[in-house]
Amino acid sequence: MAEAGASKGGEEPGRLPEHEEEEESPLWHGAGHCKWFNVRMGFGFISMSSREGSPLESPVDVFVHQSKLYMEGFRSLKEGEPVEFTYKKSSKGLESIRVTGPGGSPCLGSERRPKGKTVQKRKPKGDRCYNCGGLDHHAKECSLPPQPKKCHYCQSIMHMVANCPHKTVSQQPTSSQGRHEAEPQPSTSAFLREGGGTYGYSSPSYSQEGRSEISERSGRSPQEASSSKLSASPEEPSRKGPSVQKRKKT
């Protein structure tokens, strides 16, 4: 029983006593300037020139993260910027806990910004802003408030591009030209069959003497000659017509 009580009251092997806890590393106060700072990664190093008010023989580097900077907006440090800070010693080295400007003022910060977070201007490629009509940006980048809708072709607010009269006028000559080319030319045989009443043309008038003269030469009567002219191909009247007119003039 005594042994059991002693084992219970004694300390377990492998455990540190409660009074032997690790003490936190103490904080020191230092001053110096920013050695370098990467604005994209958000960290850098401070060159400490004095500690607890006493100058150091050689500068000591202290790690600094952007989360430890006392300032508003985008947190960063400018190279050579004077700072005051509190720091501690860790397994990785000296790390800053809080960084301010001289006298506890906010840090100034660097003017540089990460390239990935800045809004890059779009190069004009012929595109047009649908809001204001500008060529150097798109509608989502337009600084003006939403403008009234207007035609993208002539920039008029009276109609949309689907009903633009200027666009239809520019396309009309090409369509009308194709329509005229597609229309077939009327043949001379149609003029003869219709009696010359179409398009203001009239069929050539032959006198009775001319008809009899033609029928005598061909050996047919005037009625047969006239019927043969109507049943002939379209090319025959065009060849015979001028020859008959020349005979009449002579």
Swiss-Prot record:
It holds the Pfam family zf-CCHC. The keyword Transcription regulation does not apply. SUPFAM superfamilies: Nucleic acid-binding proteins, Retrovirus zinc finger-like domains. Residues 1-27, 98-126, 165-250 are annotated as: Disordered. Zn(2+) 2 binds at C151, C154, H159, C164. SMART domains: CSP, ZnF_C2HC. Its main location: nucleus. Residues 114-125 have a biased composition (Basic residues). It is found in: Nucleus, Nucleolus. A zinc finger (CCHC-type) spans 127-144, 149-166. Zn(2+) 1 binds at C129, C132, H137, C142. The keyword Metal-binding applies. GO terms for biological process: miRNA catabolic process; pre-miRNA processing; RNA 3'-end processing. Residues 9-18, 210-219 have a biased composition (Basic and acidic residues). Keywords: Metal-binding, Nucleus, Repeat, RNA-binding, RNA-mediated gene silencing, Zinc, Zinc-finger. Transmembrane segments: none annotated. Residues 168-177 have a biased composition (Polar residues). Residues 29-102 form the CSD domain. Residues 200-209 have a biased composition (Low complexity). InterPro entries: CSD (IPR011129), CSP_DNA-bd (IPR002059), Lin-28_RNA-binding (IPR051373), Lin-28A-like_Znf-CCHC_2 (IPR054081), NA-bd_OB-fold (IPR012340), Znf_CCHC (IPR001878), Znf_CCHC_sf (IPR036875). Belongs to the lin-28 family. PANTHER family: PROTEIN LIN-28, PROTEIN LIN-28 HOMOLOG B. Suppressor of specific microRNA (miRNA) biogenesis. Binds target primary miRNA transcripts and sequester them in the nucleolus, away from the microprocessor complex, hence preventing their processing into mature miRNA. The specific interaction with target pri-miRNAs occurs via an 5'-GGAG-3' motif in the pre-miRNA terminal loop. This is Protein lin-28 homolog B. It comes from Gallus gallus (Chicken). The lineage of its organism: Eukaryota, Metazoa, Chordata, Craniata, Vertebrata.
